Amino acid sequence: MKDYIYSIEGMDILVEQKALDKSIEDQAHRLQAYYIKKIREQSGMDRKAFCEWLGLPYRTLQDWELGQRVMPEYVLRLIAYKVQMEKAAGRL
């Protein structure tokens, strides 16, 4: 298996092979953690600034990015949408 592009709410995220090298049952959690981290990185913010911007507790985002907690799919899509719209408007 090789790297591939995942598109979520108009944002293209490169998924590297190393993010997929775990068991299938663990893969969904790892991918979700990978996606939220890449979305934050595309916003150009660190965790603290990203949390303040979204109104999220820091520990929640940290747990999502580390795969210690599962976020609802709709939350991932809403965050991706907000980042995409703010970038398009030139505010990020």
Language model features: what each stretch is:
Residues 1-30, 85-92:
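N-terminal flexible/basic segments that precede or flank functional cores
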Residues 34, 38, 59-62:
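Positions in alpha-helical segments
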Residues 35-49, 78:
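Short basic helix-loop element that most often maps to the first helix and adjoining turn
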Residues 70-92:
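DNA major-groove recognition helix of helix-turn-helix/homeodomain DNA-binding modules
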Residues 60, 69-70:
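A secondary-structure capping/hinge motif
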Residues 44-62:
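Short alpha-helical DNA-recognition segment
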Residues 35-36, 54-55, 82-83:
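Secretory-pathway ectodomains
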